[in-house]
């Protein structure tokens, strides 16, 4: 009963120890027509680490090193980082106060890459207004809708980089 008032008084809150429940600015993103976003608390917590340019520079350097080693064996590296649900739907959060903007994909975009890079966030964002349930409403995983979009993108990259 202690936490009961927050369901009526707060728009954005940590619903329990693990899940945030925040207002969206549209009810069109999920097939259940909810204007709420449920996401795992560690999505928000990991944003600080994922937004650190030094971490991204280091990651990219390691991936470029791996790419060079794989090239010696005639293997091409495809890197496809996945946005978490918080990152994917951040732009649709109605009140962003207290919610750090995820910039991992912006930082990755600026890197010089020797590997094949698929910006899965950009690929999925291009479909978010025309296809509902990119991520499941009540889960942290992307749905079969997103899986099909990403599979087609991977297939295209493989065909273009033979």
PLM regions and their residue ranges:
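Extracellular glycan-modifying ectodomains
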Residues: 1-162
């Amino acid at each position: 009963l202690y936490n009961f008032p927050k369901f009526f008084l707060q728009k954005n809150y940590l619903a329990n120890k693990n899940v945030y429940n925040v207002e969206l600015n549209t009810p069109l993103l999920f097939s259940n027509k909810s204007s709420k976003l449920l996401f795992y608390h560690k999505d928000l917590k990991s944003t600080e680490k994922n937004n650190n340019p030094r971490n991204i520079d280091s990651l990219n350097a390691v991936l470029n090193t791996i790419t060079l080693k794989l090239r010696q064996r005639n293997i091409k590296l495809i890197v496809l980082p996945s946005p978490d649900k918080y990152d994917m739907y951040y732009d649709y959060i109605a009140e962003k106060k207290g919610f750090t903007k995820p910039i991992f994909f912006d930082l990755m975009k600026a890197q010089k890459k020797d590997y094949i890079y698929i910006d899965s966030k950009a690929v999925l964002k291009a479909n978010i207004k025309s296809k509902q349930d990119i991520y499941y409403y009540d889960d942290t995983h992307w749905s079969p809708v997103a899986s099909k979009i990403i599979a087609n993108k991977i297939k295209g990259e493989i065909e273009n980089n033979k």
